[in-house]
Structures are given as structure tokens and as C-alpha cells.
Design a protein with these regions (language model features):
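A short helix->loop->beta-strand "cap" motif at the edges of active sites that frequently abuts
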Residues: 144-148
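N-terminal post-signal-peptidase region of extra-cytosolic proteins
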Residues: 46-49, 92-98
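Generic structural signal for well-ordered alpha-helices
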Residues: 100, 133-137, 178
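Catalytic His-Asp segment of secreted/periplasmic serine-dependent ester chemistry enzymes
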Residues: 156-235
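Conserved beta-strand scaffold positions in the cores of enzyme catalytic domains, especially
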Residues: 63, 83-85, 192
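Oxyanion-hole/transition-state-stabilizing segment in secreted/luminal serine hydrolases
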Residues: 64, 70-82, 94-131, 150, ...
Length: 235
């Protein structure tokens, strides 16, 4: 179990950087564009697995996002029933849109979403990121009308490895996206969890003690994240 947890964390980290190693040992996939990402097996394999999830309507507390979500061991950190993790390493806003039907099928009680850092990494235009995120929120409200929706801000980073983007450039884009999300959540009457400043140290860096590599969270980061949202899961 411990080995599986470590292996899964390593896979999530590599996936978030645009590197997928099947079984973490053999087949290596690298992508630098959105189109390339959807050609590697990782996304379809996860969706196939998610299709098998079954639950009574209005019982599941669902987390959906990219590698930061996928690496979140919900049962270990939150220690409660009916938790579902639909994180996929490397995923982007368009990927979330493609698989919202899986969320609709489950009709969760609560939905926690965090997505966007990979869109920024792949240099997808901000206008498109915002448009697709707005579609995600609107679609969730229509397809899961009884669910409580929590849009979590994109977290700070310490630059993004494998790109030419400085931390200043990344931080500017993340702040712009978070500002849009905050306004969008007010307009659409859904919850916005502004986690960014809680994870931030001076100059928009992700706090060193919360990360392995400057973008993905370590156990301490997940423990801290859990503390911020636990009260929202227990009511």
C-alpha cells in the first residue's frame, strides 16, 4: 500500500509535467500541446476507470481536476466515506468539459473542482481558458442542480519545469484566472474557495514546505489543503 501510494504520487507529478510513464517504468509519453495530450493513453484510461464508479445519487463528494487532485489521497487525508477522486494528470479545462457526463451520472452531493494550471503551462489563450471554465460551472449547475459546487482557486507555483515561463509570468496568469473565477462564481451563485493566498509565500511562490517540485503538493501540502476544506465536507 505504501509503495502504491508513492508510485501514484510519482506518476501524478510526471503527468503534471507533461510526461507519462506507463507503470512508471516502461512506456514514456511527452506532450507539449493540448492536441498531443489527448492522443496519449492517460486520459482515456482514467475515463474508462471512472465509468465503472457507481453510487447512490446525492451521496458522493467528488473531486475533479488535474494531477494536483489526482495526487490527493482523499481517504487518508480526509478519512470519511463517499469520497471520489476524478483527477487526471495533465488535464485541462477542455478535458474536464469532455468528461462532465461522468459527474452528471453520479449526481454528487458536493463537487470540488481545481483546474487551469496545465492550460497555463500549455499557453492556451486566457480568453479560451476562462470561456471553458465558465462552461464547466454552468454545465455543472444545470446537470447537477442539487449539488454544492466549490470552485477552488488555482494554486501558486514556483515556475513550471519544462517551459520557458518564469514564476512572474505564471503568477500573473494564475492571478488573472483566479480573479475571473471569483467574479464568475459570484455571478453564478457557486462557492469560490480562494486557496491561493493560503499556499503563497512572498513573490507569488508556492510555499516550499507544501511542494516537492514547485507545483505539485507533498503530504504536508495535502494535509494543509484538507484542513481548509474539512468543514465543508462534514455538514
Amino acid at each position: 500500500m505504501i509503495f502504491d501510494h508513492i508510485r501514484n504520487r510519482i506518476c501524478a507529478i510526471l503527468g503534471g509535467l507533461g510526461i507519462l510513464v506507463t507503470g512508471c517504468t516502461k512506456t514514456k509519453y511527452v506532450w507539449s500541446t493540448e492536441e498531443e495530450y489527448f492522443k496519449v493513453p492517460i486520459w482515456k484510461e482514467h475515463v474508462k476507470k471512472f465509468k465503472k464508479i457507481k453510487a447512490q445519487p446525492h451521496t458522493v463528494k467528488l473531486f475533479i481536476g488535474d494531477s494536483i487532485t489526482e495526487g490527493f489521497d482523499l481517504n487518508r487525508h480526509l478519512n470519511m466515506d463517499s469520497l471520489v477522486n476524478m483527477g487526471i494528470s495533465g488535464d485541462v479545462t477542455s478535458g474536464i468539459l469532455k468528461r462532465l457526463y461522468l459527474v452528471e451520472k453520479l449526481q454528487p452531493k458536493k463537487i470540488f473542482i481545481m483546474i487551469g494550471i496545465n492550460d497555463i503551462r500549455l499557453k492556451i489563450p486566457m480568453e479560451r481558458i476562462q470561456s471553458q471554465y465558465a462552461q464547466i460551472i454552468q454545465s455543472l449547475k444545470l446537470s447537477c442542480p442539487d449539488a454544492e459546487i466549490y470552485v477552488q482557486s488555482v494554486l501558486p507555483a514556483r515556475g513550471i519545469d519544462g517551459t520557458d515561463m518564469t514564476n512572474e509570468v505564471v503568477a500573473k496568469s494564475v492571478r488573472e484566472l483566479n480573479h475571473f473565477l471569483e467574479k464568475q462564481c459570484v455571478e453564478l451563485n457557486v462557492h469560490f474557495l480562494y486557496l491561493y493566498p493560503l499556499f503563497e509565500e512572498p513573490k507569488d511562490f508556492l510555499r516550499q514546505e507544501y511542494t516537492y517540485d514547485g507545483i505539485h503538493l507533498c503530504d504536508e501540502g495535502y494535509r494543509f489543503w484538507s484542513e481548509q476544506i474539512l468543514h465543508l465536507l462534514t455538514d
